[in-house]
Amino acid sequence: MANRNLSESLFKPRQKHQETSTLVKHRDPRLIAGNYSTLDGNSHGSWYRMINRLMWIWREIDPFEIEEVLCRIAMTNAQRSDDNLLDTVIGYRKGNWVFEWSHQAMLWQQRALQAEQIPEASNFWLKAANLYSIAGYPHLKGDELSQQAVILANKAYENAARCSGYQLRKIEFKLKEGGCVTGFLHLPQQLQRPSPTILVCGSLDNLQSDYYRLFRDYLAPLGFAMLTVDMPSIGYSSRLRMTQDTCILHQQIIHQLDEIPWIDHTRIGLFGFRFGANIAVRLAYLESKRIKGVATLGAIVHEWLSSVERQQNSPSMYLDMFASRLGIYNVDEKAFRLELGCYSLKKQGLLGRRCSVPMLAGYWQNDIFSPKEESKLIAMSSMDSQLLAIPTTPVYNSFNKALREISQWLRNKVC
């Protein structure tokens, strides 16, 4: 009942909220590029958001449920901020992206409250958490409805963990500039001693709660604990902004791991997804004595950040997401591209230098955000490296196999 009341109080009718696609302003007209990326999904001319079926299904959202929600959004006649984009319905009502995904989450939340078996309740809460997270996607700063969905996602996630066989600890990490940031420490079952730990550096469009399956199915069976933290400007890190020192948040966390009794701070590995790989690789150079291994998947460390052509061919949502993380809301295209180039680890003078930390770089052929050259650059920079090519078909099985190979590689390097 308390959770239902929280949902009602957060989403009660108010004045019109600013629609997500209008939060970042561009001086030049934008084109909705039609592209496909294995790790990020499809970008269609009729949708503002990228439709990321692979990752949503991997997070155990039923494919039919995904299509049902998308259909409800597409079929509405409600007012849109852009009549050409289906997911731009204004206000919290039927057809609005946050409304429809949150409505779906509430159905699972209700089932969780009525569940008679604890494992069943945990599974239902986790589904609710994932659906609330999708409701907030792509988590742009200033999106009030998205922020409300994130609150519910975190609440549902904590309820899921409370009902599961694993332990979830909320850890407060102190920041040099004052205040704290909250991370989730996931601990394996029957913990008897401090665990080797993987710090996940997530992609810019995901909450830290989106990686539970990575822990449950891949890391925990190998004896790992998993530590997550939200990327700057979203979730528990919403008041922070991404800077050219991309790893500053995660670096401060690494310096505090020796204070956490459940973590073996002498056995720490990193797993970086997309732009999270930028953070992980940067940390490998700056904290080489504290890190035993770094794995990356679809890394964004140089090519996309430096290529005007790649950026021009990228979906509008993706550019808006980067601008939002950097705290840019009125975009001058030329200045924005110059700013993105400053985040290249090669231009920063790091990538290309030999690094003592073992690194694995996984990639998909013809990835619009992370070409093979990106992963080769990472592999060539480490004295102990592996390049992992991931087949594009069958997409789900290949992704699952890659995660198992990467997890085993981390075990060999970290444990």
Swiss-Prot record:
One of its GO terms (molecular function) is carboxylesterase activity. Transmembrane segments: none annotated. Keywords: Hydrolase, Serine esterase. It comes from the Bacteria. It catalyses: a carboxylic ester + H2O = an alcohol + a carboxylate + H(+). Belongs to the FrsA family. This is Esterase FrsA. The gene is frsA.
